[in-house]
Amino acid sequence: MARLQQHFREKLAPELMAKFGYTSPMQVPRLTKITLNMGVSEAVADKKVMDHAVSDLGKIAGQKPVVTMSKKAIAGFKIRENQAIGCMVTLRGVQMFEFLDRFVTVALPRVRDFRGISGRAFDGRGNYNIGVKEQIIFPEIEYDKVDALRGLNISITTTAKTDEECKALLTGFRFPFKN
């Protein structure tokens, strides 16, 4: 069992139950999935760029990413239908908790000029989105072998009904929010 998963079961769930006055343990908000998405617009011109992006995202997530294809042609962006434009990974279960642990304890402190993550990136339904500007903050990526700096979006999906419940859950997982 992952360290954060054990922390959730033993300490965090009872704390949230007391804080929000839940009557059943099934009402306690929990993590459903974490989705990592990397848009690779340079892949339109050079196909090898997509291979590097898939490799980087695979190292970060610990599982093989799915290449996302364009749904329709957009002439302004020089994109054809069914052309590779990005890659994504959905993490659940133990891998999700392991990634979250590495992200909060190792990757976030390596961000330059880091002062905490925004408390305004909630979507109103109990989910949270974080944009990472450089993939090199993750220890799995070797700086010397990186061909280009790419960002990625991290979407954390929870069963929380409100943003307040989601923020309490993520704060319990030691997310460093500003203020």
Swiss-Prot record:
Assigned GO CC terms: ribonucleoprotein complex; ribosome
Protein's UniProt keywords contain Amino-acid biosynthesis: no
Annotated organism of origin: Albidiferax ferrireducens (strain ATCC BAA-621 / DSM 15236 / T118)
Keyword entries, A-Z: Ribonucleoprotein, Ribosomal protein, RNA-binding, rRNA-binding, tRNA-binding
Function according to Swiss-Prot or TrEMBL: This is one of the proteins that bind and probably mediate the attachment of the 5S RNA into the large ribosomal subunit, where it forms part of the central protuberance. In the 70S ribosome it contacts protein S13 of the 30S subunit (bridge B1b), connecting the 2 subunits; this bridge is implicated in subunit movement. Contacts the P site tRNA; the 5S rRNA and some of its associated proteins might help stabilize positioning of ribosome-bound tRNAs.
Similarity section: Belongs to the universal ribosomal protein uL5 family.
Gene: rplE
Protein name: Large ribosomal subunit protein uL5
InterPro entries: Ribosomal_uL5, Ribosomal_uL5_bac-type, Ribosomal_uL5_C, Ribosomal_uL5_CS, Ribosomal_uL5_dom_sf, Ribosomal_uL5_N
Cross-referenced Pfam families: Ribosomal_L5 (PF00281), Ribosomal_L5_C (PF00673)
